[in-house]
Amino acid sequence: MLFLYACSRETEGPEKPVPDLLTIPPGFPEMPFPKDNELTVQRWQLGKKLFYDPVLSVDGTLSCASCHQASLAFADDKAFSPGVMSRPGVRNAPSLANVGYHPYYLREGSVPTLEMQVLVPIQEQNEFAHDILTIAKVLKEDSV
């Protein structure tokens, strides 16, 4: 993903996939990962940091965790999850449980990959109302 590539440091060494980072419950298949975005410790840590970081919203007030609450199975209990500047949302934030197994994203199935789906709330005017180029610049300057 261009977004994550722009956030990386050039001095970092190559990342190695870490297949045992996740414990797959009995009866579940292996989690599919794109060849160009395999799970690594660094990507896991970056994803967790970004999930809780309000820098992804244009006014710095919302993070993914604002609506995908851990105490609610990473879902929201509101019919329409609110966006930045108290803008009314247009959809409910669904649970993220087992999201890596989903064949498509958003209720209508309009987004084919998880890597593409993460861009939707960031750019949606009623959610984070931000743009990827600005976020990439801010994150590249971040010390983490």
Predicted regions and their residues:
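Sec-dependent bacterial lipoprotein signal peptides
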Residues: 1-5
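Periplasmic c-type cytochrome electron-transfer domains
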Residues: 7-144
